[in-house]
From Swiss-Prot:
This is Serine/threonine transporter SstT. The gene is sstT. Belongs to the dicarboxylate/amino acid:cation symporter (DAACS) (TC 2.A.23) family. Its main location: membrane. It catalyses: L-serine(in) + Na(+)(in) = L-serine(out) + Na(+)(out); L-threonine(in) + Na(+)(in) = L-threonine(out) + Na(+)(out). It comes from Neisseria gonorrhoeae (strain ATCC 700825 / FA 1090). It is a multi-pass membrane protein. It comes from the Bacteria. It holds the Pfam family SDF.
């Protein structure tokens, strides 16, 4: 018993990032050496992601409602500058992907269209309609289905009603509930090393490394664009807001948010992680409690890259010459489409046919490109989610720190 306690204390003294690195390394070894054991260990990953996905909608709803209910008149949440950064970042990602697609034209071997079962949206109007319908969804269904647009809408409305008509006791109860749910999130995050061990070992056991070799160039363009956005474009945007070296903040967000998101492959599951990081950075709670759930829905730079690169690859594969005007239009369409990716089953991949339609590519060919996307998804989806989710907290921090700098001047 004493040995067990001392072991737990010893583990507790090791930083969470180092524990995650150890879980990652062990997962690679187990998944490679014993695929059967790796698949069995996947249960830990499923439980971890399931717990995060379960608590995230409740956390967002209660935290946003509590923030609005406690909000004092005269205080501002300063959401608009963050939304502007989200849009600038997403458009920059799409434009970068267009340029990369023209400089490094990629041809792909198309997979069978039968590999894709879901139906893509028929146009941009359907994407926007999906977003608006999510806005007015039943609040219970919104929480149950992790519809964050609906959750935000109802939390804002309920919080405003409590602020104007609720008693002090009622508002305090909601605030206490928010604190309690945040504590539960901290407990879940402590299991991240075990969860990531399970996710990595099962992924390697299922796919290995050989399945991705045939699409090496496509993956190189995709990951290169995402790395360029994360390490060059985003830091430039952050510098514009805070006017000092952005890289300490950038690397903090990548390390403490991006790593989680890479392995969970879910922006929704990463919301509690981003909330905890925003609190650790000392950001304004009225701001991040709204901007981070919103970012998980509309800040989709990684999705814009995926849509654009695969659409450009489809055009090159079909022998279609893409002029600059069409490429610029593709950037705009990818930006708007990416912002609606969370409202579409299948996410960014199922919006590729919409982008392909700009080039007159048939839906049959476009769906084969989507099938290729699913093949490389083990890497593409992880990197895309890491970029999307880490950028949520990065831009929130940049806007908040920039506002503090302006106020100090």
């Amino acid at each position: 018993m004493a040995f067990g306690k001392s072991l737990f204390h010893a583990i507790g003294r090791v930083s969470l990032v180092r524990q995650i690195a150890a879980g990652l390394a062990l997962g690679i070894v187990i998944g490679s050496v014993s695929p059967q054991l790796g698949l069995a260990a996947g249960l830990f990953g499923s439980l971890f992601v399931g717990a995060l996905k379960a608590v995230a909608p409740v956390l967002v709803f209660i935290l946003v409602a509590a923030t609005i209910a406690q909000h004092q008149k005269g205080n501002k949440a300063h959401i608009r500058p963050i939304i502007v950064l989200y849009l600038i970042g997403t458009f920059s990602a799409a434009l970068t992907a267009v340029i990369a697609g023209m400089v490094f034209p990629t041809h792909i071997v198309l997979a069978g269209a039968g590999d894709v079962s879901a139906a893509p949206p028929s146009g941009i109007v359907e994407v926007l309609k999906s977003l608006l319908m999510n806005l007015v969804a039943n609040p219970i269904n919104a929480i149950a289905n992790a519809n964050y647009i609906g959750i935000l809408a109802w939390a804002l409305v309920l919080g405003a009603a409590l602020r104007n008509h609720g008693s002090d006791v009622t508002r305090q109860v909601v605030a206490d509930l928010a604190e309690a749910v945040s504590t539960v999130v901290k407990w879940i995050i402590r299991f991240a090393p075990l969860g990531i061990f399970g996710l990595v070992s099962s992924t390697i056991a299922e796919t290995g490394f050989g399945a991705l070799a045939g699409y090496a160039k496509l993956l190189a363009v995709l990951l290169g664009c995402m790395a360029f956005i994360a390490l060059a474009v985003n830091p430039a945007i952050v510098w514009w807001k805070i006017r000092r070296n952005p890289y300490p903040l950038v690397f903090t967000c990548l390390r403490e948010s991006g790593v989680y998101a890479f392995f969970t492959r879910s922006s929704a599951a990463n919301i509690p992680v981003n909330m905890a990081l925003a609190k650790k950075l000392g950001l304004h709670e009225d701001t991040y409690s709204i901007s981070i759930p919103l970012g998980a829905t509309v800040n989709m730079g990684g999705a814009a890259i995926t849509i654009t690169v695969l659409a450009m690859a489809a055009a090159h594969t079909q022998g279609i010459q893409v002029d600059f005007a069409t490429a610029l239009l593709l950037s705009l369409v990818a930006t708007v489409s990416a912002c609606g990716a969370s409202g579409v089953a299948g996410g960014s991949l199922l919006l590729i046919p919409l982008a392909c339609s700009l080039f007159g590519i048939s839906n049959d060919v476009a769906m084969q490109v989507v099938a290729v996307g699913f093949i490389i998804g083990v890497i593409q989806d992880s990197a895309e989610t890491a970029l999307n989710s880490s950028t949520d907290v990065l831009f929130t921090a940049a806007a908040d720190l920039g506002r503090q700098r302006n106020r100090a001047e």
